[in-house]
Amino acid sequence: MTPACEARLDAGLAELGLEVDATARERLLALLALLHKWNRAYNLTAVRDPEQMVTRHLLDSASVATAVRGPRLLDVGAGAGLPGLVLAILDPSLEVTMLDGNGKKVRFQRQAVLELGLENVTPVQARVEHFTTRDFDQIVSRAFAQLATFVELTRPLLAEGGEWLAMKGRDAASELAELPPDVTLIERRDLEVPGDAAQRVLLRLRRA
């Protein structure tokens, strides 16, 4: 990757207040290179420019890292492995399962796990309603579904006392209003992604 990509990544991580060791930094840059390479053939993301990938994929995913405690994390609708791969790189103690029904995207996830040597990540190709592994401490979604749908489809997979982490636009009030009465919002956190003017929030939810 170019020096400009490296500089953008380093500055963005510092702005997010994340301390990243050399191994994690190398893996993030390797993930970026792999995503850029595969995207030319497999159209994994609409973002083509590597510098924009740093902002809109790596830093956007990293922006929720301080809310992730795990240890068992499920990334639903993971697509090209975002945010799951980034979170697994930043915190090797996490046990990350990435779930997506799109075969080419899961193949990319598996290749990334192999090439980056990530022993704490398990990619799974399946629809969420057919997935039966349970007791995840946290379930994260970056661009999966409406909030109420996300909660209802993944409810059986969440451990007692577990949390949902939903990355949404800041106009999420209508989606919050449609949540079932036994689900409560415990935190609404504005996401300030370095270099990205998009208005985003992280919603932390729990069973009431």
From Swiss-Prot:
Assigned EC number: 2.1.1.170
GO cellular component: cytosol
Residue spans crossing the bilayer: none
GO molecular function, one term: rRNA (guanine-N7-)-methyltransferase activity
Main location: cytoplasm
This protein's UniProt keywords: Cytoplasm, Methyltransferase, rRNA processing, S-adenosyl-L-methionine, Transferase
SUPFAM superfamilies: S-adenosyl-L-methionine-dependent methyltransferases
Disulphide-bridged cysteine pairs: none
Enzyme class, broadest EC rank: transferase
Pfam families: GidB
Domain of life: Bacteria
Residues bound to S-adenosyl-L-methionine: G77, L82, V128, E129, R142
Subcellular locations according to the entry: Cytoplasm
Catalytic reactions of this protein: guanosine(527) in 16S rRNA + S-adenosyl-L-methionine = N(7)-methylguanosine(527) in 16S rRNA + S-adenosyl-L-homocysteine
Function, as annotated: Specifically methylates the N7 position of guanine in position 527 of 16S rRNA.
Similarity section: Belongs to the methyltransferase superfamily. RNA methyltransferase RsmG family.
Protein name as it appears in the record: Ribosomal RNA small subunit methyltransferase G
